[in-house]
């Protein structure tokens, strides 16, 4: 028998739907800061945070997490992705995303990296309107 597929949006930061139930980790931009400061140990910190999150999710019955955000941000003009992205630098964002996915996987949780490439360049919130990227 297979366990039920139960997913949750638990990125850290303000997209944490288990507030008060699970450990509150910072937004994913902290992962980029850690990796930029020290690549090897930064990636391990990111992996361990995702692993800890994954273990808590498994304990709560979740088998799937909608995280991490793999897209890059354009910074303050980006109302949707912003601090949910590890970095404006694609290489840093890729390293952070890979480390997080490995951590979730090690905890036995399926990870969905999101959002569509380029979403971080949108200047309107996709929850409110259809962004147009040029």
Predicted regions, residues:
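Enzymes and membrane/adaptor proteins characterized by extended Gly/Ser/Thr/Asp/Glu-rich
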Residues: 1-93, 115, 120-134
């Amino acid at each position: 028998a297979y366990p039920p597929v139960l997913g949750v949006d638990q990125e850290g930061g303000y997209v944490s739907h288990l507030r008060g139930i699970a450990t509150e980790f910072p937004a994913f931009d902290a992962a980029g800061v850690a990796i930029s400061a020290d690549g090897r140990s930064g990636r391990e910190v990111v992996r361990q945070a995702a692993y800890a999150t994954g273990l808590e999710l498994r304990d709560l019955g979740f088998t799937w997490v909608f995280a991490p955000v793999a897209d890059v941000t354009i910074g303050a003009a980006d109302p949707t992705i912003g601090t949910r992205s590890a970095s404006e630098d694609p290489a840093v964002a890729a390293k952070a995303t890979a480390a997080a996915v490995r951590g979730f996987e090690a905890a036995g949780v399926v990870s969905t990296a999101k959002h569509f490439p380029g979403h971080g360049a949108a200047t309107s919130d996709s929850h409110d309107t259809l962004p147009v990227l040029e």
